[in-house]
Amino acid sequence: MKIVKISPRGYCYGVVDAMVIARNAALDKSLPRPIYILGMIVHNKHVTDAFEEDGIITLDGPSRLEILDKIDSGTVIFTAHGVSPEVKQRAKEKGLTTIDATCPDVTKTHDLIEAKKAEGYHVIYIGKKNHPEPEGAVGIAPDIVHLIERADDLKTLEIPTDKILVTNQTTMSQWDVQHLMEDIQKKFPTAEFHKEICLATQVRQEAVAKQADVADLTIVVGDPKSNNSNRLAQVSQEIAGTKAYRVADVSEIQLEWLQGVENVAVTAGASTPTPITKEVIAFLDQYDPMNPATWERVRKVPLQKILPRVKVKKEQ
């Protein structure tokens, strides 16, 4: 079996920055304990499990405000997906120490929404409902931001001004966003468009679109909650025309997927630890359908190998 290692793949700078911020927090003895992450720091359970070993507690729930209600003391880390001003204010009122690990690309979108609100605009925001990134973006100005996920959402959308800005969740499929923007243009011809697909998401999607078409199958390594991982599988199937499966790690690979497969492409979401992806590639590389000794699919990567290394500051 030939392995097509799609490049680029895996971690983006926003994810690495967020994890380094959280690791440094774990090592900082001056921070009030306990230390919580408000939601998953990035959408990967292997990462959150590794942080649990570091003594950082991940709390998840329907919304950031509801999660925050569970916390009465200590330190709170805001995830790479960003949070609303209301969440920041609530944390301040509760006397919590806060650390912001918001991805710079997400912050840029928040700043854009604030600027356009000041100019009297309404904002159409293309994103996934119940995902933390749109939750934070809508929370910047809930009175003028309208979340849409699909074309059907436009049917009932009415906006009381011609001053309209259209932007989007950074991890969406660029093709889906483009199609929705075309639909929006038809209904709101005066709308201004500001596509915010982050560069890391864009180049990973384009790599799959261009490189997966030579494969019989694409394996996307990523957490089920990772929107960008799910979009990579979608791009493989809809743009490259190659059947795709998303797996959290090697243990989720089904042998029947590999029947008759000669070329398999492998990519990974922006929040997927590199050792987890390498383990998937190693399994596929040695797999022989005629040799049961090569069929074992067990994740063996230790949690201490999941997180990026940080330098421990020496005490003065």
Curated annotation (Swiss-Prot):
Disulfide bonds: none annotated. It catalyses: isopentenyl diphosphate + 2 oxidized [2Fe-2S]-[ferredoxin] + H2O = (2E)-4-hydroxy-3-methylbut-2-enyl diphosphate + 2 reduced [2Fe-2S]-[ferredoxin] + 2 H(+); dimethylallyl diphosphate + 2 oxidized [2Fe-2S]-[ferredoxin] + H2O = (2E)-4-hydroxy-3-methylbut-2-enyl diphosphate + 2 reduced [2Fe-2S]-[ferredoxin] + 2 H(+). Keywords: 4Fe-4S, Iron, Iron-sulfur, Isoprene biosynthesis, Metal-binding, Oxidoreductase. Isopentenyl diphosphate binds at residues 43, 81, 131, 226, 228, 271. [4Fe-4S] cluster binds at residues 12, 103, 198. Dimethylallyl diphosphate binds at residues 43, 81, 131, 226, 228, 271. Its EC number is 1.17.7.4. GO terms for biological process: dimethylallyl diphosphate biosynthetic process; isopentenyl diphosphate biosynthetic process, methylerythritol 4-phosphate pathway; terpenoid biosynthetic process. Pathway: Isoprenoid biosynthesis; dimethylallyl diphosphate biosynthesis; dimethylallyl diphosphate from (2E)-4-hydroxy-3-methylbutenyl diphosphate: step 1/1; Isoprenoid biosynthesis; isopentenyl diphosphate biosynthesis via DXP pathway; isopentenyl diphosphate from 1-deoxy-D-xylulose 5-phosphate: step 6/6. The keyword Lipid biosynthesis does not apply. The active site is at residue 133. Catalyzes the conversion of 1-hydroxy-2-methyl-2-(E)-butenyl 4-diphosphate (HMBPP) into a mixture of isopentenyl diphosphate (IPP) and dimethylallyl diphosphate (DMAPP). Acts in the terminal step of the DOXP/MEP pathway for isoprenoid precursor biosynthesis. Belongs to the IspH family. This is 4-hydroxy-3-methylbut-2-enyl diphosphate reductase. It comes from Bacillus cereus (strain G9842).
